[in-house]
């Protein structure tokens, strides 16, 4: 409609013309098909085949008739017959239908590919509408308010920025949880003195990790675990293999970290309210984690020396007044439902954390 303004032909008018012209094929008068035909006409004229394929997949998912499987009843429904004809016209083969019909089993890689197409389309459409409103000099407070809320909702859900945990599954698949994962800290590919954390499908040895592409990698452990939690990749039933690398991480600490994330940020998150999106984002829930994957007394424990002292202040521990707070990881959920991860390290970690917060 916006692209045709001001000479807009409404779908209702096209529908009436078809009826008065005695074009009464019920399949073509179905509201979903009427909308699809209009979009197909528009995108085909512009040569935008990728966008058209996305529209076709959306329509196929909406109708929810799995054509790669036999019908449940004896007779095929009219929707199934219609989509058998449409998918033949689109050139979809059995393999593509089977992939789409297995959407409930899609995991991170397939969901990530579909998400990229959706994000590109939603972002393009929002920018187009914003430009359309500016060109027409729309001054309605309601229109500008709606566009503002929509823009912030898209920004909160899809905009990438430093420290923000990417949400990859906006309803594309019902469950991304993996049965078996391997968590490993390995030397970075471009700098052997740097270490990175990575999460892999299945049970892998340290040597095998180099032969497979990880689902996700990150410099810091908490950023990676927060991503796994936010996207439901790890759930209580997931079995984890750990290769701690240069860290002091063990199974007990890892399980406690995951449980802390579950308790602090239970899923699914409630949607951000319109009122929250009209205001600047603000912290709603904060989780602070101390010395993740680090033994602050490692130089003593390696020698089998265990310090005991009445001076238990972790910032001024024992007779040597040692600062045991070496790192702080902060996970913050804000009022726009953005999950943000920050890290501080060194003797001034606590002061830096308080100052930045």
List the model feature ranges, each with a label.
Residues 1-357:
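Nucleotidyltransferase catalytic cores
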């Amino acid at each position: 409609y916006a692209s045709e303004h001001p000479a807009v032909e409404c779908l209702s008018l096209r529908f009436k013309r078809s009826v008065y012209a005695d074009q009464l094929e019920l399949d073509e008068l179905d509201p979903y098909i009427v909308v699809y035909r209009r979009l197909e006409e528009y995108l085909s004229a512009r040569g935008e085949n990728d966008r058209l394929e996305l529209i076709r997949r959306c329509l196929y998912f909406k109708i929810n008739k799995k054509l790669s499987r036999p019908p449940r009843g004896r007779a095929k429904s009219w929707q199934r017959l219609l989509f058998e004809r449409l998918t033949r016209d689109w050139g979809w083969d059995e393999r593509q239908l089977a992939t789409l019909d297995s959407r409930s089993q899609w995991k991170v890689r397939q969901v990530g590919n579909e998400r990229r197409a959706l994000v590109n389309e939603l972002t393009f459409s929002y920018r187009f509408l914003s430009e359309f409103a500016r060109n027409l000099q729309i001054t309605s407070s309601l229109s500008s308010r709606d566009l503002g809320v929509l823009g912030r909702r898209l920004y909160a859900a899809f905009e990438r920025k430093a420290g923000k945990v990417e949400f990859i599954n906006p309803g594309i698949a019902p469950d991304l949880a993996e049965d078996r994962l391997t968590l490993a800290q390995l030397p970075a590919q471009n700098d052997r003195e740097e270490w990175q954390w990575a999460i892999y499908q299945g049970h892998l040895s340290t040597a095998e990790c180099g032969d497979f592409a990880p689902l996700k990698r990150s410099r810091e452990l908490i950023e990676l675990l927060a991503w796994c939690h936010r996207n439901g990749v790890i759930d209580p039933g997931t079995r984890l293999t750990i290769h701690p690398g240069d860290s002091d991480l063990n199974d007990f600490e890892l399980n406690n970290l995951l449980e802390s994330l579950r308790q602090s940020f239970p899923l699914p998150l409630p949607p951000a309210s319109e009122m929250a999106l009209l205001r600047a984002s603000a912290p709603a829930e904060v989780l602070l984690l101390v010395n993740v994957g680090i033994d602050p007394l490692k130089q003593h424990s390696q020698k089998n020396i265990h310090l005991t002292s009445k001076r238990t202040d972790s910032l001024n521990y024992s007779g040597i007044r040692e600062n045991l707070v070496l790192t702080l990881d902060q996970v913050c959920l804000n009022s726009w439902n953005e999950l943000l991860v920050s890290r501080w390290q060194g003797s001034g970690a606590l002061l830096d954390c308080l100052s930045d917060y």
